[in-house]
Design a protein with these regions (language model features):
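Basic, Lys/Arg-enriched alpha-helical interface segments
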Residues: 1-70, 76-94
Length: 94
């Protein structure tokens, strides 16, 4: 899948602890090699639609597992996964 890594994602990823940064690298590498369908079924990435979270233009947002507690927030535009932000607290990601 194509990736669009937004500055907000990069900034938030760089502010995280070393284990979360390592998880971000692993998640990005995995996502880059899978289709959307494969990501939706991948147990490690655990891509799921975030209920009630929409972008400003009304597109659904998704979460991806970075570590046991950290999640990446993303949206999908065509065949591109747009990475928006890294949230270190699982509960705050939703």
């Amino acid at each position: 899948m194509k990736l669009d890594i937004r500055p907000t994602f990069l900034d938030s990823a760089l502010r995280q602890s070393a284990p979360v940064q390592k998880g971000v690298r692993k998640m990005v590498e995995t996502a880059a090699h899978l289709s959307l369908g494969e990501l939706l079924n991948h147990e490690g990435v655990h891509l799921e639609k975030a209920k009630g979270l929409l972008t400003r233009d009304g597109k659904p947002q998704y979460t991806l597992r970075v570590t046991r507690s950290a999640r990446a927030i993303a949206t999908v535009e065509g065949d591109t996964l747009v990475l928006l932000f890294v949230e270190p607290d699982h509960d705050k990601a939703y």
